[in-house]
A protein has these predicted regions:
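N-terminal amphipathic/basic-hydrophobic helices that include classical n-h-c signal peptides
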Residues: 1-13, 191-199
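Short, low-complexity N-terminal intrinsically disordered segments enriched in polar/charged residues
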Residues: 5-37, 41, 45, 49-53
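Short beta-strand edge/turn micro-motifs at domain boundaries
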Residues: 12, 100-102, 123-157, 162-167
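Short beta-strand segments enriched in hydrophobic/aromatic residues
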Residues: 39, 51, 107-109, 141-144
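A solvent-exposed, acidic/Ser-Thr-rich amphipathic alpha-helical stretch
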Residues: 44-113
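Short, surface-exposed coil-to-beta transition loops
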Residues: 83-85, 118-125
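Short, cysteine-centered beta-strand-loop-beta hairpins and adjacent loop/turn segments enriched
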Residues: 110-119, 147
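Acidic/histidine-enriched, glycine/proline-rich intrinsically disordered or flexible terminal extensions
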Residues: 150-199
Length: 199
C-alpha cells in the first residue's frame, strides 16, 4: 500500500507553474516565427496582428493601423527578404508580472536591395505581453551586428526549376498571394511578370 503514491522511477511530475512557463515560452517562440514568415510573405495584416492593439509607433502615434503604414513604407524600399531566426533567450515576468516577458532573438537576414544582395546579422530586443491568453509584441527593437553585400545576387540567377535543378532562383516569395497583393501596382527594380516575380 505504501508504494501506491510513489512516482514511477524516471518519471517526473510537472507542476502547474512549470507547465505554464514552458507553454508561455513555446507561445513566444511561435510569435517570433510568425513575425518572420509574415514579414517575408508581406502579410502585413498578419504581421501587425502579432502586436498589442495599442502598440507605440514612433513618438506620437499608436495602434496597428499606424504600424501597418510604417511597415508598408519600410518594406517598399527593399525587395525579397528572408529572416532566419535562431538563438532566443526569454525572460518571463515574476510574481505580479506573469503576463509580461522580455527576450533577445538572434537573426540572420538576407535582403534584396535593388541589384545588391545583403546579409545582416541582427539581434531583436523584444518586450512581450499576454493579452487575453495570447502573447504579443509590445516592442521590437532591431539592432545590427553587421550588414554585408554578397558577391552574387541570387535573384539574378536563372530559374532553378525545382526539383529538377538544385541551384538557381526559386518561386518564393513570388507565388505567395500576400506578396503579390503587396507588390501590385508598385514600381520594381526589375521587370516583373503578373505574379511580381522578376523576369
Amino acid at each position: 500500500p505504501g508504494r501506491m503514491g510513489r512516482p514511477t522511477p524516471g518519471k517526473r511530475v510537472m507542476s502547474g507553474d512549470r507547465l505554464e512557463r514552458l507553454t508561455a515560452e513555446a507561445d513566444i517562440r511561435q510569435l517570433v516565427a510568425r513575425y518572420a514568415v509574415c514579414l517575408d510573405k508581406r502579410d502585413l495584416d498578419g504581421l501587425v496582428a502579432l502586436f498589442v492593439p495599442d502598440v507605440q509607433v514612433g513618438r506620437d502615434t499608436t495602434g496597428r493601423r499606424a504600424l501597418h503604414d510604417s511597415f508598408a513604407t519600410q518594406l517598399a524600399t527593399v525587395g525579397v527578404t528572408i529572416l532566419n531566426t535562431g538563438t532566443h533567450q526569454i525572460d518571463l515576468g515574476g510574481p505580479g508580472a506573469e503576463d509580461l516577458a522580455t527576450g533577445h532573438v538572434y537573426c540572420k537576414a538576407e535582403i534584396q536591395d535593388g541589384d545588391r544582395w545583403i546579409h545582416q546579422a541582427i539581434r531583436y530586443d523584444d518586450t512581450y505581453r499576454r493579452v487575453e491568453g495570447r502573447w504579443l509584441f509590445v516592442r521590437r527593437i532591431h539592432r545590427l551586428f553587421y550588414g554585408a553585400e554578397v558577391g552574387e545576387n541570387p535573384l539574378a540567377l536563372a530559374p532553378a526549376n525545382w526539383p529538377a535543378g538544385h541551384t538557381g532562383m526559386g518561386t518564393l516569395p513570388f507565388e505567395d498571394p500576400t506578396w503579390q497583393d503587396f507588390n501590385s501596382g508598385k514600381d520594381s527594380t526589375a521587370p516583373t511578370d503578373d505574379t511580381g516575380r522578376p523576369l
